[in-house]
From Swiss-Prot:
It comes from Natronomonas pharaonis (strain ATCC 35678 / DSM 2160 / CIP 103997 / JCM 8858 / NBRC 14720 / NCIMB 2260 / Gabara). GO terms for cellular component: cytosol. The active site is at E42 (proton acceptor), E53 (proton acceptor). This is Tryptophan synthase alpha chain. PANTHER family: TRYPTOPHAN SYNTHASE ALPHA CHAIN, CHLOROPLASTIC, TRYPTOPHAN SYNTHASE, ALPHA CHAIN. It comes from the Archaea. HAMAP family: Trp_synth_alpha. Its EC number is 4.2.1.20. Keywords: Amino-acid biosynthesis, Aromatic amino acid biosynthesis, Lyase, Tryptophan biosynthesis. The alpha subunit is responsible for the aldol cleavage of indoleglycerol phosphate to indole and glyceraldehyde 3-phosphate. GO terms for molecular function: tryptophan synthase activity. It catalyses: (1S,2R)-1-C-(indol-3-yl)glycerol 3-phosphate + L-serine = D-glyceraldehyde 3-phosphate + L-tryptophan + H2O.
Amino acid sequence: MSLEDAFDEPAFVPYLAAGDPDFESSLAYVEALARGGADVIELGLPFSEPIAEGPTIQQAVVRSLEGGMTPERFFEFVETLDVDVPLVCMTYYNLIYQYGPAGSQPVVPFVERAAEVGLKGFVVPDLPAEEAGPLREACDEYGLDLVFIVAPTTAGDRLERMMEQVSGYVYVQARLGVTGAREDVSDRTAETLARLEAYDVPKAVGFGISSGEQAEAVVAAGADGVIVGSALVDIVAEGHENGDAPDVVADRLESLARELKSGAVAGKQRQPGPERT
């Protein structure tokens, strides 16, 4: 299934850092999200300087790195997963650029390896559209998508450059600032979605969604899906701190996943329909 096909109905797109808090537990957690109704799963390949992340995901990155996660280990993780949903790698450009044997062409070895293990695309928060040419070309060569993050403040000319290169879906930032679960949904979300109506690519809203009610409201505002990270990572962190068994944590993740997916689907029923004459 392609990334765009995953948005045939309102999509639930969860994020977890691969390897948090350890390889085996993380496998179970990702598979629990798939059982809970995930349509696409974003897997974080940890980088030592995660500039786009809030404290919750920063700590997940630390746990993953301390557990031995590396790019090659990440690819092994993807190969080991038993899920039937598209997987997207969320990481930082330095890891993509530096991967591969000495003297190899930058970017291409990482994208080639990603295609080999079955990944469907990338989200690269620190890569401006103006500098994305090499990665876009490699993705085209190996059949992968490149997702960009659009903020409420993204200027029109920069938005145009993003939308010329984006594929799969657009990651719409619901709030300004770094990621993290919030108590409400920004009023600017609908405004940002309205700016994107002219572009024929699914729009998935993230940065702060933590409940089924929020997921419903975001889809009702016109989104094609919701992206949820911090609320799920919080469950992993709490389970790790309390010493809970992985299957217990997995059950909690699956339960929240079902709530979020149900909320997204319910939101579709609230979207304005075509005007009747």
